[in-house]
Amino acid sequence: MLRQWWLRSVGSCSTVYRAHSGCSTSAAVKPKRAIPTDGLQLSDFIKESTKKQRQKAIIPSIEDTKEYLNPEDLQGNGRTVCYVTYGCQMNVSDMEIVRSIMTKYGFVESDKKENADIVLLMTCSIRDGAEKKVWNQLKLIRSNSVNKGQIVGVLGCMAERVRHDLLEKRNLVNIVAGPDSYRDLPRLVAVAAGGSNGINVQLSLDETYADVQPIRVDSASKTAFISIMRGCDNMCTYCVVPFTRGRERSRPIESIVEEVQRLRDQGYKQVTLLGQNVNSYRDMTSMDFSMAPSTSQEDRVPGFKTVYKPKSGGLTFTTLLEKVADAAPDIRFRFTSPHPKDFPMQLIELIASRPNLCKQLHLPAQSGDDETLERMERGYTRDLYLRLVDDIRHVLPSVSLTSDFIAGFCGETEQAHQNTLSLIRAVRYSFCFVFPYSMRGKTRAHHRLTDDVPEDVKARRHLDLTTVFREEALKLNQALIGSEQTVLLEGKSKRDASFSHGRIDGGVKAVFDNSKLCLEPGQYAKILITDANSQTLKAQLIGQSSI
């Protein structure tokens, strides 16, 4: 656009110059070409240049700050850090990595935001409401702080998406660190302590934190998260994740198996494997490709499409799942969040063959309407999705399916909404994560589509989706009454300490009287389901059990 404007201007000026310089010309003098009313003016470029200069002044480069820091400046020396986490399980896992890095440098954890020397917030940008919570929390932290020199840092997706907005509010934020910059936090703290902004939001093509041993939030818990890959290549039009977390890259398979073995030796009983697109995992670092499929087509469900060139070679998610299941047969394994296209039959058959691979699959549909799915660029139709569900249930008859749905996406008609409701009734999910659509900057929807569904309509459709999924979940749970299930104890009931709660293999929460056997969290129990609502099972404890 700039080049086109410059050529128009130069062409006009040169014509006028010839006319006034006495140069002979047979052509008539052309009038200066007018700039379209919807085009860019010179003032637009001046404004943009001024904005970039202001941002450059606010945001120093890494090179500007490295040269005057000594190694001892990076040490915590007992300074306290309060960690605050918002958002998904991936953010919980990321904060465990941050804890490990900061602890290594001599920083000490504190649970008091108002007194801590440093407060680090792990943030989410998936919806506008998630960001508003962080902005409100930042104001509260500053207003309640009794530490005048307190340093506040914003980490994760929001740091990547609204970096400039954060640092322009210097009274609220001192550090901005993107998802691939956590190793740099000690330096960023040192920069902020010196009175400057500390920022690193550079996305990486290879950072996986594979060598960092996380410090987990709840040391008493027997469940853990393991991040196996980062980033996403799917580019769904509504989603900001590819822009805040970058391209897909996977940890070496050996590092994941080793972490599973450590957790096994520490007594953990459930591990959830995490990734933005977890079942597209592909380890390209290992020299052992003997178990890898020869073509990428074997890794995808037939008919499902991608917006990127499919990868081939390496060790796939199916191989990884087989290795971790064999490495820790007493640990239950779950995984999230997957994409429906990455559920080949080899994966489903493996899950069926291993008792410690939970028969609970998250299958994000987002919509049950073909036109809406096309605008979302999900790469499948309603019919393809339903065929996948049928194929899964053929191999795993008792599988528990969960899903994600967006209410009121761009251009969604009332008929499209009804199509989504009918999909929920047809599939019958155990649980659905349902949210009204929130347009995010940088996404393809932001550039190409119109957020044209009124907020009150989004709210009503959101309620419809929630109501229908709960009706179907109630039917599923009531069908379990009278059956025996294996449950992994997670803790005591908040209402009655004599009762314990845990989750069955399908992921549904169960509550039961544990006063006689007094089983501890991390132990397996056999229970008899006696009652149910849409989200919880009531049960009678039969006795201790195993997988």
UniProtKB/Swiss-Prot annotation:
<comment type="similarity">
    <text>Belongs to the methylthiotransferase family. MiaB subfamily.</text>
</comment>
<dbReference type="InterPro" id="IPR020612">
    <property type="entry name" value="Methylthiotransferase_CS"/>
</dbReference>
<dbReference type="InterPro" id="IPR002792">
    <property type="entry name" value="TRAM_dom"/>
</dbReference>
<feature type="domain" description="Radical SAM core">
    <location>
        <begin position="218"/>
        <end position="475"/>
    </location>
</feature>
<dbReference type="Pfam" id="PF01938">
    <property type="entry name" value="TRAM"/>
</dbReference>
<keyword id="KW-0411">Iron-sulfur</keyword>
<dbReference type="GO" id="GO:0005739">
    <property type="term" value="C:mitochondrion"/>
</dbReference>
<dbReference type="InterPro" id="IPR013848">
    <property type="entry name" value="Methylthiotransferase_N"/>
</dbReference>
<keyword id="KW-0004">4Fe-4S</keyword>
<dbReference type="GO" id="GO:0000079">
    <property type="term" value="P:regulation of cyclin-dependent protein serine/threonine kinase activity"/>
</dbReference>
<feature type="binding site">
    <location>
        <position position="232"/>
    </location>
    <ligand>
        <name>[4Fe-4S] cluster 2</name>
    </ligand>
</feature>
<feature type="domain" description="TRAM">
    <location>
        <begin position="478"/>
        <end position="543"/>
    </location>
</feature>
<keyword id="KW-0408">Iron</keyword>
<dbReference type="GO" id="GO:0046872">
    <property type="term" value="F:metal ion binding"/>
</dbReference>
<dbReference type="Pfam" id="PF00919">
    <property type="entry name" value="UPF0004"/>
</dbReference>
<feature type="binding site">
    <location>
        <position position="239"/>
    </location>
    <ligand>
        <name>[4Fe-4S] cluster 2</name>
    </ligand>
</feature>
<comment type="function">
    <text>Potential regulator of CDK5 activity.</text>
</comment>
<feature type="binding site">
    <location>
        <position position="157"/>
    </location>
    <ligand>
        <name>[4Fe-4S] cluster 1</name>
    </ligand>
</feature>
<keyword id="KW-0949">S-adenosyl-L-methionine</keyword>
<dbReference type="GO" id="GO:0005829">
    <property type="term" value="C:cytosol"/>
</dbReference>
<dbReference type="InterPro" id="IPR007197">
    <property type="entry name" value="rSAM"/>
</dbReference>
<feature type="binding site">
    <location>
        <position position="236"/>
    </location>
    <ligand>
        <name>[4Fe-4S] cluster 2</name>
    </ligand>
</feature>
<keyword id="KW-0479">Metal-binding</keyword>
<dbReference type="InterPro" id="IPR006463">
    <property type="entry name" value="MiaB_methiolase"/>
</dbReference>
<feature type="binding site">
    <location>
        <position position="124"/>
    </location>
    <ligand>
        <name>[4Fe-4S] cluster 1</name>
    </ligand>
</feature>
<feature type="domain" description="MTTase N-terminal">
    <location>
        <begin position="79"/>
        <end position="194"/>
    </location>
</feature>
<dbReference type="Pfam" id="PF04055">
    <property type="entry name" value="Radical_SAM"/>
</dbReference>
<dbReference type="GO" id="GO:0051539">
    <property type="term" value="F:4 iron, 4 sulfur cluster binding"/>
</dbReference>
<protein>
    <recommendedName>
        <fullName>CDK5RAP1-like protein</fullName>
    </recommendedName>
</protein>
<dbReference type="InterPro" id="IPR006638">
    <property type="entry name" value="Elp3/MiaA/NifB-like_rSAM"/>
</dbReference>
<dbReference type="GO" id="GO:0035597">
    <property type="term" value="F:N6-isopentenyladenosine methylthiotransferase activity"/>
</dbReference>
<dbReference type="InterPro" id="IPR023404">
    <property type="entry name" value="rSAM_horseshoe"/>
</dbReference>
<dbReference type="GO" id="GO:0070900">
    <property type="term" value="P:mitochondrial tRNA modification"/>
</dbReference>
<feature type="binding site">
    <location>
        <position position="88"/>
    </location>
    <ligand>
        <name>[4Fe-4S] cluster 1</name>
    </ligand>
</feature>
<dbReference type="InterPro" id="IPR038135">
    <property type="entry name" value="Methylthiotransferase_N_sf"/>
</dbReference>
<dbReference type="InterPro" id="IPR005839">
    <property type="entry name" value="Methylthiotransferase"/>
</dbReference>
